[in-house]
Amino acid sequence: PRGSPRTEYEACRVRCQVAEHGVERQRRCQQVCEKRLREREGRREVD
């Protein structure tokens, strides 16, 4: 089965921080992954 949204969020941050570099990396990854998480949850509610 798919991981929980929280698990997917953590995995997103890990992948993002591997791909990104720099001081802003952690905050930018957090914003990107939170946005993605909200969009996924929003779609699930609409379905």
UniProtKB/Swiss-Prot annotation:
The record marks R2, G3, E45, V46 as: Cleavage. Disulfide bonds join C12-C33, C16-C29. It catalyses: Endohydrolysis of the N-glycosidic bond at one specific adenosine on the 28S rRNA. GO terms for biological process: defense response; negative regulation of translation. The keyword rRNA processing does not apply. Keywords: Disulfide bond, Glycosidase, Hydrolase, Plant defense, Protein synthesis inhibitor, Toxin. One of its GO terms (molecular function) is rRNA N-glycosylase activity. It is an enzyme of class 3 (hydrolase). It comes from the Eukaryota. The keyword Nucleotide-binding does not apply. Its EC number is 3.2.2.22. Inhibits protein synthesis in animal cells. Homotetramer. This is Ribosome-inactivating protein luffin P1. It comes from Luffa aegyptiaca (Sponge gourd). The lineage of its organism: Eukaryota, Viridiplantae, Streptophyta, Embryophyta, Tracheophyta.
